[in-house]
Each structure stands twice: as structure tokens, then as C-alpha cells.
Amino acid sequence: MLEDLGYMYRFSDTSSSEVRGKEIAEGFLSVCEYTGLKGRWQVISEHPKVVCDTGHNVGGWEYISKQLSQVECNKMHIVFGMVEDKDIDGILALLPKNATYYFTKSRNKRSVSENVLKIIGEQQGLIGECYPTVIDAWESAKNAAKPDDFVFIGGSSYVVADFLENSI
């Protein structure tokens, strides 16, 4: 959709338009606020800081992993689940090793078992426990987190959807 907007802008006559580059940039920076789009580095709370993101492929996780590496916190907790048609090994290789993991699965039938994620995660140096639902994983992470910790929920749009539908 954003590509379509860029295409429309590129090939439209903007010479008489009152909208300038600055306004367009501000619009893109506020797209979640203006459109109601949820789940893209969405901050849920501050103490502890809780963020969810729907990134679900290697390209998205290359970006998310950079963001996670810049987070300043005492301890990082990651509630994580995926669907089976994604590059599980490739994505798990991008996850921070210094976090505690809460491996889970969404209600979607294509979800990878939390037990499988844990096994593959351990091969990548990721340490954590398994939870049968996103909400169980979230509750455990929330209870373990201190005010100066960071909790991330993601790995799949379905994981974020389960979280947002049932926890806020």
C-alpha cells in the first residue's frame, strides 16, 4: 500500500499542490496514529517498557534486531512465536542472546509449536521456556519484569494480534 502511495505521488502533478515534502514526511512518521495501524514498534507501556512488533520475516527482523540492540534496560524479556512458512532459523539467528525467551504460539493453525521454537532457539543460544498461548507467555513475562526491564512481543502478526486482543 505504501508503495502504491509512493507511486501515486511520484507520477502526480505536485507543482500546484500545497503539500510539501515536510508534510509528507510528517505523515509517514505518524501513519500509525492517523490510520489506526497497530503492531509496528507499538509501545504499550513504559515501566516496564512493553513493545510489540509484527515483523515476521528476515528483512523485518534485521530492522527489529537493530532496534532491540539499542534498547537500554536492566533485563530483556521476549515473548516470541512464528508461523511455519517463515525462515525460522534465519530469524532466530537475529534475536538477541541476552534476553529471556517466552516461546509460544498464536491461535493460528499455521503456528509453529512453542516446543519446536524452543529447541531451535536453544541451538541458536536462546534461553527460555514454553507457553501454550500468547497470553500465558505474556503473563509470565509481565510477572517477571521489573520496572526497568523491557518486554517485547512479536515474531508473527498473529502473536501480536493475540496479545492486543486479549491483554489490553
Where is each model-derived feature located?
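Short glycine-/acidic-enriched loop or helix-start segments at secondary-structure transitions
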Residues: 61-62, 88-90, 113-114, 162-165
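Short, Lys/Arg-enriched, disordered terminal segments
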Residues: 13-19, 147, 165-168
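Short, well-ordered alpha-helices that flank and scaffold nucleotide-derived cofactor binding pockets
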Residues: 66-70, 93, 119, 143, ...
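C-terminal helical cap/extension that packs against the catalytic core
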Residues: 3, 49-50, 91-150
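Nucleotide phosphate-binding/pyrophosphate-handling subdomain across enzymes
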Residues: 1-100
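Active-site-proximal loop/hinge segments that shape catalytic or ion-binding/gating pockets
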Residues: 156
